[in-house]
Regions:
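Interfacial loop/beta elements and low-complexity acidic/Ser/Thr-rich segments
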Residues: 1-141, 145, 151
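Conserved small/polar residues in nucleotide/adenosyl-binding loops
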Residues: 166
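Extended, charge-rich, solvent-exposed interface segments
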Residues: 152-162
Length: 167
């Protein structure tokens, strides 16, 4: 079991089980120096330290070294003798995530002809594509620690229903 744990610390990537997620948070904040980060073609990796985005890795394979990626030098863990970085890593999908449904009550209006109160409801379907991964992490994921699709789509649905307008 120890060999698998060591191997897991050498390679940083979103697991296959997270491929359908909009955001996946790497579970360990201690990242070994010279570990390899693998970012899928439809994702980016966002590095956060103390509530700030420190850097973004584009798709590809990257060796985590401060010489190759200068922003890593800002969060070297000196307690480890400089052999590790302390950072949160979020893998953010940049492809389109389709077929999310929403629906709910909008408002009550009075029918001018009959005088009856009518409850208006709306239903629809939407897709999500993350245009700015840094903003998503800073404004939604990082502040309320939301990383699963249900929580993110719940927030989006609430935003859609809150921006209602009755004509």
């Amino acid at each position: 079991m120890g060999l698998l744990n060591e191997s897991r610390r050498e390679f940083i990537a979103a697991p296959d089980s997270a491929k359908g997620q909009i955001v996946f948070k790497w579970p360990d904040i201690n990242i070994r120096k010279f570990a390899r980060a693998i970012v899928e073609p439809d994702a980016v990796a966002v590095f956060m330290h103390q509530g700030q985005v420190m850097g973004v890795l584009l798709p590809g394979q990257h060796t985590l070294d401060a010489k190759e990626l200068p922003f890593l030098g800002m969060f070297v863990d000196w307690a480890s003798g400089g052999n590790a970085f302390r950072s949160e890593i979020f893998f953010v999908g940049t492809r389109e995530f389709p077929n999310f449904r929403f629906g709910g009550r909008l408002d009550e209006v009075q029918d001018p002809q009959s005088g009856l109160i009518v409850t208006l409801r709306t239903f629809g379907e939407y897709s999500i594509r993350v245009a700015d991964p840094q903003k998503l992490i800073l404004n939604l994921v990082g502040t309320v620690n939301v990383t699963d699709n249900n929580a993110i789509t719940g927030w989006v649905t609430q935003q859609l229903l809150d921006r209602k307008s009755v004509v």
